Amino acid sequence: MTSEPYWKTKRLDEMNTVEWEALCDGCGLCCLNKLEDWESGEVVFTSVACRLLDGESCRCKDYPNRQATVPDCIQLTPDQVEDIAWLPPSCGYRLVHEGRDLYWWHPLVSGDPETVHQAGISARGRTVSEEHVSVEDFEDYLCDWPMTVLLQAEESGDQ
């Protein structure tokens, strides 16, 4: 008898810290700078990454201290998942919150942290660090691929 994986049986608010952190697939999309239109409230992604994002691994270079270094870094909690519309449709937190399963490329399913990159879901190779871009120039880096990577992966047959 095989038991179901924890993400299929627990709500986000029932997970312990280790389970919660493992839901992050390491795509790095959360770590892209976003711009919000003050009039419409629309949030758009840029390809400008947080200075702490490792462009190869798509993981934070200083995760334990990230909020001290980057004060506006969002520490995602179960209560926030529903309210953050910019979480990509491929996000493990979003999927579990919506009662959906994780995709084959998620490290919890594949057992390999590289599959998120192999599937083309991550930010690897698509970003520039904010250390090299003036805030005034962020608009030059607007992009929509963070919200469409899942569709692109599905269209290429990588479901």
Curated annotation (Swiss-Prot):
A Pfam family cross-referenced in the UniProt record is CxxCxxCC
Q: What is the lineage of its organism?
A: Bacteria, Pseudomonadati, Pseudomonadota, Alphaproteobacteria, Hyphomicrobiales
Question: Belongs to which family?
Answer: Belongs to the UPF0260 family.
Stated name of the protein = UPF0260 protein Avi_1324
